[in-house]
């Protein structure tokens, strides 16, 4: 399996079931859900509960989520949608993904940077390959005026939760050997320079993100290749 497809299969599993412990009608057109693990839920995220779509009004990490009360929530659980996934060079991502999709349809985004270098083992080795991964977990709040002073709690913290869940799934995959990894919080990753300062624009959208870097060893799969 190609590395880009393997990572896509991991991202597709990022659909945790969230338990709602309590629902309070705030009497102001909103309702607050008590939730122990908010994962990557953040303000303005679209979530679906019992077939109804809500835009998150506010949240407290791993405590509660406030949404409109047009339809009061009566179920105990809901499934969080997996982040969007894209791979390619920065120019490909900007041209094919950032420009072609509206804001509501592309964030949060998990972006696997290419080109990828895979080091393959001998055919008699139980290991398949070492793959060098550089993955960005990205989100944008540039058009939300009230987020200027709160980007860290509203963007970086949820993105770290998204990264942690991804790593948990990656490590639990049967073909993955134990690995270490580096994490870097990236503010305004839409602007990039190889030297000092931010001088060269890569993405049209101004983004905040979390960068994951690791070399992961994958074992050969037992699946039939017939």
Which residue stretches match the model-derived regions?
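Well-ordered, non-membrane alpha-helical segments in soluble/globular domains
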Residues: 1-12, 154-169
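Acidic, metal/cofactor-coordinating or nucleic-acid-engaging core segments within structured domains
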Residues: 161-183
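Short, charged interaction patches at domain edges and termini
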Residues: 1-16, 118-130, 176-226
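Short, solvent-exposed beta-alpha or beta-beta edge segments that form flexible loop/patches at the rim
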Residues: 84-150, 189-206, 224
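Short beta-strand-to-loop capping motifs
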Residues: 69, 137-140, 216-218
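Small/polar beta-strand repeat architecture
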Residues: 18-27, 36-39, 48-89
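Loop/turn positions that initiate beta-strands
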Residues: 42-44
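Structural beta-strand segments of beta-rich domains
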Residues: 31-33
């Amino acid at each position: 399996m190609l590395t880009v497809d393997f990572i896509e299969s991991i991202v597709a599993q990022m659909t945790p079931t969230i338990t709602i412990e309590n629902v309070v009608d705030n009497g102001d057109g909103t309702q607050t859900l008590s939730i122990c693990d908010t994962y990557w839920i953040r303000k303005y995220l679209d979530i679906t509960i019992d077939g109804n779509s809500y835009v998150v009004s506010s949240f407290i990490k791993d405590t509660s989520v406030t949404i409109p009360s047009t339809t009061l929530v009566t179920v105990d659980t809901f499934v969080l949608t997996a982040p969007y996934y894209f791979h390619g060079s920065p120019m490909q991502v900007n041209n094919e993904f950032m420009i072609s999709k509206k804001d509501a349809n592309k964030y949060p985004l998990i972006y696997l940077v290419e080109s990828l270098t895979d080091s393959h083992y001998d055919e008699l080795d139980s290991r398949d390959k070492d793959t060098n991964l550089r993955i960005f977990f990205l989100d944008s709040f540039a058009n939300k005026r009230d987020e200027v002073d709160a980007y860290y709690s509203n963007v970086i913290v949820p993105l770290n939760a998204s990264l942690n869940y991804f790593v948990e799934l990656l490590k639990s995959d049967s073909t993955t050997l134990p690995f270490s990894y580096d994490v870097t919080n990236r503010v305004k990753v839409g602007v990039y320079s190889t030297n000092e300062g931010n001088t060269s624009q890569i993405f049209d959208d101004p983004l905040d993100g979390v960068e994951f870097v690791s070399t992961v060893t994958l074992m050969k799969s037992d699946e039939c290749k017939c």
